Swiss-Prot record:
Organism: Yarrowia lipolytica (strain CLIB 122 / E 150)
Region (Disordered) residue spans: 136-158
Gene: AIM11
Gene Ontology CC terms, in alphabetical order: membrane
Chief localization: membrane
Protein name, per record: Altered inheritance of mitochondria protein 11
Length: 158
């Protein structure tokens, strides 16, 4: 197949044109992934704002404000089990939405797409990879070698 624009010596597409097309596809995929991460972070932020607003409304509606000539040292009777359950619900929704906002925000800002990639980035940033390599390459003590040989022998007998 011959092309007029971008022809090489044999009449095929020039490699720079195909490389540019591949780069453009990578950029489009990267843009789509970043947009998805942004939308996840935005959704988690909206969930956090909604849960905070509901919690504030729930707290303010339960406040006891006595009217004139009412005793302010004896609030009206209420169902303590219901109050405790609502407190747990409010705290849980706020904690989960805040945690999800932090997770999606870090993933978006650090360009993390999977848990495996997150683990690798954290290992490199915290220096755990060097420590693992040192431990892996450390010489084995005679006691450890003897124990390893005994365990290997016991497992071979079975």
């Amino acid at each position: 197949m011959k092309f007029r624009f971008g022809e090489g010596a044999e009449g095929t597409l020039n490699t720079s044109v195909t490389t540019a097309m591949i780069d453009q596809e990578k950029r489009a995929a990267d843009l789509k992934r970043r947009k998805n991460q942004m939308l996840l972070f935005g959704g988690a932020t909206l969930a956090t704002l909604a849960s905070c607003r509901l919690t504030a409304r729930g707290i303010s509606s339960r406040r006891y404000i006595p009217k004139m000539f009412q005793a302010n040292h004896m609030p009206p009777q209420s169902d303590m089990v219901k109050e405790a359950a609502m407190a747990v619900v409010f705290a849980t929704t706020m904690a989960l939405s805040s945690f999800s906002m932090v997770v999606f925000g870090v993933a978006w800002s650090q360009d993390v797409t999977s848990l495996k990639q997150f683990a690798l980035k954290m290992k490199t940033k915290l220096g755990a990879q060097q420590i693992e390599d040192e431990i892996r390459n450390a010489p084995m003590t005679p006691e450890t070698q003897d124990l390893q040989d005994q365990l290997a022998g016991a497992l071979k007998k079975d």
